[in-house]
From Swiss-Prot:
Listed EC numbers: 1.17.7.4
Organism of derivation: Bordetella parapertussis (strain 12822 / ATCC BAA-587 / NCTC 13253)
Pathway in which the depicted protein is active: Isoprenoid biosynthesis; dimethylallyl diphosphate biosynthesis; dimethylallyl diphosphate from (2E)-4-hydroxy-3-methylbutenyl diphosphate: step 1/1; Isoprenoid biosynthesis; isopentenyl diphosphate biosynthesis via DXP pathway; isopentenyl diphosphate from 1-deoxy-D-xylulose 5-phosphate: step 6/6
Binding-site residues for (2E)-4-hydroxy-3-methylbut-2-enyl diphosphate, renumbered to this chain: H51, H84, H134, T174, S232, S233, N234, S276
Keyword annotations: 4Fe-4S, Iron, Iron-sulfur, Isoprene biosynthesis, Metal-binding, Oxidoreductase
Binding residues for isopentenyl diphosphate: H51, H84, H134, S232, S233, N234, S276
Top class in the EC scheme: oxidoreductase
Cofactor(s) the record lists: [4Fe-4S] cluster
Function, in words: Catalyzes the conversion of 1-hydroxy-2-methyl-2-(E)-butenyl 4-diphosphate (HMBPP) into a mixture of isopentenyl diphosphate (IPP) and dimethylallyl diphosphate (DMAPP). Acts in the terminal step of the DOXP/MEP pathway for isoprenoid precursor biosynthesis.
Protein name stated in the entry: 4-hydroxy-3-methylbut-2-enyl diphosphate reductase
Family: Belongs to the IspH family.
Length: 326
């Protein structure tokens, strides 16, 4: 049992709104759970379905097997692609090995993949703004055979060498800092004035909304706790947004990770959660902060999200067929 040491005596807890799960994460988790219900364990999932330890362990307990590469799944197995998306090479490998695929790629990531295909078909080279090594970035870069460049910072733009400066377009990772992405996009436009931008921002609605919510939350607090795993891009960006507002901020996987010393003397403690972090973890954090002395909890004003994405058609058909037999 956790210590009941009091370090946040009489503090107020402020909850960001919105926070936590987005529509793409809800859909991805639902796909794995529905696949398990229809076909039973094991269901193989390429990479973590979403970047959250609690979610992954919960699904593992239900029979999901998380793999790094497709060759770890037996031929003919059922495989779910994670919400981050995959390259065309991975899709080809799955088909060649006779794997039965349920695609949990977030529809907003798929939108970027379609943009890449359209831009390359028009003969343009593409600059992607994103974090090297992130699964979403690897999947998006893998939509084209060459002709793509990756930049992360304004300095990367200054050093960028392209084959055809007059025939460029750019896309972005969906979970970037809105402000950082705007700065890098601005640098691209300044260096390559004719560069074609996406028709609509590639940064997803949930990333934008959660960052905006932290910008409202942080000035009201002297500490912000961000619930999310360390490998979650959007959760890390929330911590950075709070810090840029001059507030101490910590990224935590859950209540167990709270150091009581962080709360010493704090009068107002903000709590938010990345788009892959479930609300149950937020409530556990709230309860832990109450144990440490907080006396009230208030939700900040903010957007009420109503976005929902449908399940893949193939999975929806199977569910409908099963239900019709019951």
């Amino acid at each position: 049992m956790m210590t009941a040491e009091v370090t946040a005596a009489d503090a107020e807890v402020l909850l960001a709104q919105p926070r936590g799960f987005c529509a793409g994460v809800d859909r991805a988790i639902d796909i794995v759970e529905r696949a398990l219900e229809l076909h039973g364990a094991p269901i193989y999932v390429r990479h973590e379905i979403v970047h959250n330890r609690y979610v992954v362990e919960d699904l593992r307990g239900k029979g999901a097997v998380f793999i790094d590469e497709l060759d770890q799944a037996p031929a003919g197995a059922i495989v779910v692609f994670s919400a981050h998306g995959v390259s065309q090479a991975v899709r080809g490998e799955a088909e060649a090995r006779g794997l039965r695929v349920f695609d949990a790629t977030c529809p907003l990531v798929t939108k970027v993949h379609i943009e890449v295909a359209r831009m390359r078909a028009a003969g343009r080279e593409i600059v992607m703004i994103g974090h090297k090594g992130h699964p979403e970035v690897e999947g998006t870069l893998g939509q084209a055979q060459g002709g793509m460049y990756l930049v992360e910072t304004v300095e990367d733009v200054a050093a960028l060498q392209v084959s055809d400066p007059g025939n460029l377009a750019y896309v972005t990772q969906t979970t970037l800092s809105v402000d950082d992405a705007a700065a890098v996009a601005g640098a691209l436009k300044a260096r390559f004035p004719g560069i074609v931008e996406p028709k609509k921002s590639d940064i997803c609605y949930a990333t934008q909304n959660r960052q905006d919510a932290v910008k409202l939350l942080a000035p009201e607090c002297d500490l912000v706790l961000v619930v999310g795993s360390t490998n979650s891009s959007n959760s890390n960006r929330l911590r950075e947004v709070a810090e840029r507002k001059g507030v101490a901020a910590y990224l935590i996987d859950g209540a167990h990770a709270i150091d009581p010393a962080w709360l010493q003397g704090r009068r107002s403690i903000g709590i938010t959660a990345g788009a892959s972090a479930p609300e149950v973890l937020v409530q556990q954090v709230v309860e832990r902060v109450r144990e440490l002395g907080a006396v009230s909890v208030r939700t900040m004003p903010g957007l009420e999200e109503s976005v929902a994405f449908p399940l893949p058609k193939g999975l929806s058909r199977k569910i409908a067929q099963t239900e019709s037999l019951e």
